[in-house]
């Protein structure tokens, strides 16, 4: 059947297919690439180190985020999930890669953090309405997942935040920064579809992140209410190798809060 597009999900799946299979980092089809990436644990990859993001640590130390129910998107070897669990969060952590989750479970067992629930699969499917991880969550955290999404999947990502984040809850992420000292592709969205690839991940300016996430509104018959507000947006601190925290200045760190009255 060739005329099978009826829904937004059908359109999104169709657009996924505009990218070369080897470019896939966001669906279950990309799991084998991530498995190969995590296969050699001795590689000098900064975020392979078992230490949390410096921005996440700062949010917690400053009291901006209180312990509650947390969802981590693209948890990798589990370093941030472990940190959250150690501070009293009830954690669900998702990743596409069986290899990454095997490593994360080993770390959790060693740390005595057996309460973390690790989930294998596509975060969009796992958090769909009536799915196991539908929320609500007090914190949704993403350290390096968002910048591996093609432009059209921002729609899916925003829908995930809207349905899974609790009123008054926080969303935080780190992602590639455009400009001097940054990392990632700065090609326009339209060119990505022409080339059929994401070129290692997408770089964003601070204003582009604000455009995607802050000032989002929800309209009713009588009013239009902002449902996501910016708390902080800055470059990640450059943490020394001996630091107990992870930090690389080619990344943005961002924290947003969902309005308390929004369901």
Predicted regions and their residues:
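Class I (Rossmann-like) S-adenosyl-L-methionine-dependent methyltransferase catalytic domain
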Residues: 1-73, 77-133, 149-160, 169-263
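Short catalytic micro-motifs in class I SAM-dependent methyltransferases
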Residues: 144-148
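A conserved beta-strand element that flanks and buttresses the S-adenosyl-L-methionine
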Residues: 141
């Amino acid at each position: 059947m060739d005329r099978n597009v009826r829904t937004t999900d059908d359109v999104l799946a169709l657009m996924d297919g505009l990218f070369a299979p080897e470019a896939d980092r966001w669906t279950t089809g990309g799991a084998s690439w991530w498995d190969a990436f995590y296969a050699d644990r001795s590689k000098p990859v900064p975020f392979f180190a078992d230490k949390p993001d410096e921005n996440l640590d700062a949010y917690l130390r400053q009291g901006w985020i209180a312990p509650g129910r947390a969802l981590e998107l693209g948890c990798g070897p589990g370093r941030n999930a472990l940190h959250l669990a150690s501070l009293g969060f009830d954690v669900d952590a998702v990743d596409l890669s069986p290899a990454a989750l095997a490593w994360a479970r080993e770390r959790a067992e060693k740390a005595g953090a057996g309460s973390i629930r690790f989930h294998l699969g596509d975060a969009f499917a796992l958090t769909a309405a009536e799915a196991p991880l539908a929320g609500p969550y007090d914190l949704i955290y993403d350290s390096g997942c968002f910048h591996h999404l093609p432009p059209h999947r921002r729609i899916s990502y925003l829908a995930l935040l809207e349905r899974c984040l609790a009123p008054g809850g926080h969303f935080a992420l780190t992602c590639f920064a455009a400009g001097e000292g940054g990392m990632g592709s700065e090609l326009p969205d339209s060119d990505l579809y022409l080339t059929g690839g994401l070129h290692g991940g997408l770089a964003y300016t601070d204003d582009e992140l604000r455009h995607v996430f802050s000032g989002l509104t929800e309209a009713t018959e009588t009013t239009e209410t902002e449902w996501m507000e910016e708390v902080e947006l800055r470059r990640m601190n450059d943490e020394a190798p001996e630091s107990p925290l992870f930090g690389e200045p080619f990344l943005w760190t961002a924290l947003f809060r969902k309005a308390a009255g929004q369901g």
